Each structure stands twice: as C-alpha cells, then as structure tokens.
C-alpha cells in the first residue's frame, strides 16, 4: 500500500490548501522514519487543484499563466513538479534529510497491457451493446456492474441542471474509503508524538486527523 494518498474528497471538513497537503505528505515521511523505512510514495490527485481557491493557487509561490478570466491555467504545468518543489522547500526548512522525486502519472497508465479483469469487463460491455440494441434501447451508454448485469445509462441521469456531467466523487463514508484512510495509510497519530520529536519540534502539526479536522 502507498503510505499516503491525497484526494480532494478527504478534505470534507476543512479547506484544501498546499500547506495541508504538504503536511500530510511529511506526516507519512515522519511515520516511515519512525518505522525505520527509508522509502515511500505519496499519491496526490490532480483534482485537489480544482477544489482550491484561485487565491490559494496564486499565493503558492509558483508562477502560473492565467486565462482571460484570471484563472490559473493548470494544464500548462506539471502538478507533480509543483508539489515536489514546494515539498523540498518545506523539508529543507525542517532540516529533514529526505529526498523526493516527482513522477507525473498520466495517459501511460491507460496504455498498459490489459489484465484479466479488463478483458472480462470489455467483453461484458461488448455483449451489452448487442443486448441493449436487440431490446431497442438507444441514446444510452452501456454499463455493467460487478455481477455482470448490463444496464443502460442515460445522459440525463448524470448531468446537472446546466447540462454538464456531474463528477463522481469518492464517498468518504463508504466502507472502502474508511478501510483505506483508517487502516492502509501511514501517518502521525498522538501515539507517535514522542518518537516524532526527534525529527520535528511540533509533531502534532502533522497529525493526520487534526490536519483534516476529522
């Protein structure tokens, strides 16, 4: 499991800021150092940018270009390099001897060889097209659940009042999310404060639940 995964939905009780994101990553780094593990990976969803205010992005210290409406053009920059630059600055300020490298994960993930699940899922969707066509269904997208049941999905069911498709957000109250954020990640808790003091003066500033106001 990855020591830290950061998605915008986890900030359901506080604002998304660069400071909180950096502290969450450092929280995982500190926990790994306490455990004697000298490596790790933090995944940060690029979606966090869409939940930040323009002021937060502008005050990050990163030089962005802006569109005609004054919004930062996020598509022109590498999000991984932005976070890594800010993270390295923070690590140096704390005096931590930790190196980090940015990796932008993009379309190459979609270009790997298909696995058994991919082959099965695509086959089900293909059969689903024929099934719904035979039933006279049109103007819909074919979907299949984990049981293989095929159903049509109409645009009107997923668009808002302005005709835009509503993004599907992670349900933080769902069992999968609870399992990941409660049991799979590694971060500072009150039980780690004493051990973490050898690396930072205020370990409570990196307490996972305090950062998210959980």
Annotate the PLM regions.
Residues 57-214:
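C-terminal non-catalytic interaction/assembly regions of soluble proteins
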């Amino acid at each position: 499991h990855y020591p830290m995964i950061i998605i915008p939905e986890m900030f359901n009780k506080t604002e998304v800021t660069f400071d909180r994101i950096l502290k969450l990553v450092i929280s995982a780094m500190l926990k790994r150092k306490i455990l004697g593990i000298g490596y790790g990976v933090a995944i940060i969803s690029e979606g966090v940018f869409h939940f930040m205010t323009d002021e937060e992005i502008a005050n990050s210290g990163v030089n962005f270009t802006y569109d005609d409406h004054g919004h930062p053009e996020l598509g022109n920059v590498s999000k991984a390099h932005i976070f890594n630059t800010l993270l390295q600055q923070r690590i140096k300020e704390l005096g931590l001897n930790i190196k980090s490298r940015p990796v932008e994960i993009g379309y190459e993930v979609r270009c790997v060889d298909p696995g058994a699940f991919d082959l099965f899922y695509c086959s089900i969707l293909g059969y689903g097209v024929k099934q719904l066509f035979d039933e006279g269904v049109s103007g819909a997208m074919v979907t299949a659940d984990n049981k293989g049941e095929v159903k049509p999905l109409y645009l009107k069911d997923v668009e808002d009042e302005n005709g835009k498709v509503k993004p599907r957000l992670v349900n933080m109250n769902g069992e999968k999310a609870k399992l990941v954020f409660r049991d799979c990640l590694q971060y500072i808790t009150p039980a780690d404060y004493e051990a973490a003091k050898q690396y930072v003066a205020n370990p409570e500033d990196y307490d996972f639940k305090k950062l998210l106001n959980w």
